[in-house]
Amino acid sequence: MQRNAMYLKNVAETACNFQLTQYQISHANQKPYECQICGKPFRKRAHLTQHNRIHTGGKPYECKECGKVFICCSTLIQHKRTHTSEKPYECLECRKTFRRSAHLIRHQRIHTGEKPYKCKQCWKAFASVSDLIDIGKFTLMRDFTNVQNVGRHLTIAQLLFSIREFTLVRSPLNVRNVAKHSIIAQHLLNTRELILMRNLMNVRNVKRLLGKVHILLNIKEFILVRNHMSVSNVGRLSLVFLILIDIREFTLVKNPMNVKNVVELLTIVQLLFNTREFTLVRRLMNISSVGRFLSPVQHLFNIREHILMKNLMNVSNARRPSSIMHILFDIKEFILVRNLINVSNVGRPLLLFLI
């Protein structure tokens, strides 16, 4: 009996000495136990043993319900509560229950108003570490913002001039997704930066990003090679679109256009003297279509420029593009070699034909 009493006394003293040693280590901020693989220090040997399982891959604790394995016993206990729906931690203020004590501590800060985590960039305080980590993504060097967002962690970013930083290579975006990222996006001068190579766009999608699109002088930059467009789509991009002198730049080679589509693009078109530039080689036009393009056409002295070689015309068609046709001194220029006229047809294209 005396031996058992002495043994229990020694065990109690040893346990007290061990606890005292651990307590003193916590005050001295010492971490005497170091991992031999990565060099990370720990205060307790049990923490080092648990950490070594990360390197060895050992997971000795297994759930009997679903067979999932864990590194430490406490994680297994928390996992079992998902099967039993047990929530032992209750808030005394609102009686809300939680599975983990850490969740209860974070919830209680809502009632107390405590925000112990502060951002070093703007000194804004947060109730949880996860909120601080999430909001820190907007202030890192790789996630650029503009001056309006500095000091204000905005979930809705405004005026993101370099939105490429918010898009990964393997998950390309189109302009429809850009609008969800930036609700107020105005005057993005370089839209090419908003388009990745694997997800092409057309001009129809540009309208959903930019509410007010002013005069785009060089719309070639908004069109990629594999997704061609026609001039009928250009009109939906620009509300106020002025005279495009050289519309050839707005039409790609594989998607030619005719003058019928040009009228949908240009609301105010005045005196386009060289219509050949608005017609591509593979889709020819005749003079009957020219009248739909130009509402006020005056003084077309050299109408040969409006007629292509493969679509001949006669003098009966020459009357349609010009409502006010003055004296044509040399009508030979309006007659091609393969479509001859006689004297009876000469009087038809001219309203006022003088000597």
From Swiss-Prot:
Subcellular location(s) per record: Nucleus
Gene encoding the protein: ZNF781
Record-linked Gene3D superfamilies: Classic Zinc Finger
GO molecular function terms listed in the Swiss-Prot or TrEMBL record: DNA binding; DNA-binding transcription factor activity; zinc ion binding
Gene Ontology CC annotation, any one: nucleus
Lineage start: Eukaryota, Metazoa, Chordata, Craniata, Vertebrata
Family label: Belongs to the krueppel C2H2-type zinc-finger protein family.
Keywords from the UniProt entry: DNA-binding, Metal-binding, Nucleus, Repeat, Transcription, Transcription regulation, Zinc, Zinc-finger
Entry protein name: Zinc finger protein 781
Keyword Cytoplasm in record: no
ZnF C2H2-type span: 33-55, 61-83, 89-111, 117-133
Keyword S-adenosyl-L-methionine: no
One matching Pfam family: zf-C2H2
SMART domains: ZnF_C2H2
Function: May be involved in transcriptional regulation.
